[in-house]
């Protein structure tokens, strides 16, 4: 297994601005050890086709976490991440499945934009069926979940529901699209 670390970042614990990764060809592990806080993390492109693990072994907080065109991603590991203060913005994670988003300590997300595909025609290519990887989250500012064609289980978000309201709940284009009334009535899973 090859690992791609960013030696220029060695010793850095805080990146207050933006850390951006794009158009890489790494197929195994991309890791950012030692970094505890990032203002904005942005990642896009790549040619790994569902073979890449992106790891933040020490990350505790990030302002904006953005990963677009994530067809390269197999797994995201951030075992110490507790908070995404501004926005979680991910899309096109066609190879990600249940358990591939390792976020056991994540408790708070500002804006939660979690798209499978980026349009309805791509929804059927997405594998993820549920939100269990977000079960520890207790506070979310707003939810926008779209284009996960096999997504039928939203029970992983039940701990965060008290922090939300009907106008902050937008779910569409998935295998199951519970309304605010359905989700607050405990109808987390497609009947």
Please place each PLM-identified region on the residue numbering:
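Concave beta-strand-loop units of leucine-rich repeat
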Residues: 1-11, 15-55, 61-191
